[in-house]
Amino acid sequence: MTRAFDGDTLLIATHNKGKLEEMAHLLQPFGVKVVGAAEMNLPEPEETEDTFVGNARIKAHAAARATGLPALSDDSGITIDALDGAPGVYTADWAETGNGRDFLMAMTRAHDALEAKSAPHPRLAQFRCTLVLAWPDGHDEVFEGVAPGHLVWPIRGAAGFGYDPMFVPEGYDVTFAEMDRWEKNKISHRARAVEKFVKGCFGG
């Protein structure tokens, strides 16, 4: 059975302000105070695992140990069937330029790799999000969300971020980047993982 969250403060093990604000909004009905890693002056631990859950566990447990607070972290990315699950945990790395991240470059890399393999259409892919809630005593709970879909080229849409302009979610004919934010947030991998987290740990 999932361990319930019964504290009054939850540390979000991220330096991403957007993720912090999103979680604060989602947990507002439960009266939980949310603090971020930057607020607690926590360094970003090195992500050395080759799975989403492994990297999420590293971040959550490091934050819980350092602060004595329950800590929630996430690791997410896109897996492409014809590329044997790549880029996977290296989703963001594919965009690294040494001068910031360039996701147009990353999407082009994915498309070129598919073309090189003459991958058939539809080119199936999944966005994946793994949330880990860790307690200072070493216990953790894992929640995973998946958004299945396929990739298109050329890219479409100006909203969203990352690989959104090339990803069409299952059951739709528009990319994540062509959707309203509220519409994407209802069906995204992150939304599905958060829904499981809230239901499991808050009974919401």
UniProtKB/Swiss-Prot annotation:
Ordered alphabetically, the record's keywords are: Hydrolase, Magnesium, Metal-binding, Nucleotide metabolism, Nucleotide-binding
Pfam short name (any one): Ham1p_like
Could you name the active-site residues? D75
- The lineage's top-level taxon is Bacteria
What EC number is given for this enzyme? 3.6.1.66
Residues recorded as binding Mg(2+), renumbered to this chain, are E46, D75
> Which is one Gene Ontology cellular component term of this protein?
cytosol
- What does the record give as the reaction this protein catalyses? XTP + H2O = XMP + diphosphate + H(+); dITP + H2O = dIMP + diphosphate + H(+); ITP + H2O = IMP + diphosphate + H(+)
Q: Does the keyword Nucleotide-binding apply?
A: yes
Cofactor binding summary note: Binds 1 Mg(2+) ion per subunit.
CDD domains membership: HAM1
Where, in this chain's numbering, is substrate bound?
Answer: T14, H15, N16, K17, G18, K19, S76, F161, G162, Y163, D164, K184, H189, R190
UniProt cross-references to HAMAP family, sorted A to Z: Non_canon_purine_NTPase
Please give the name of this protein. dITP/XTP pyrophosphatase
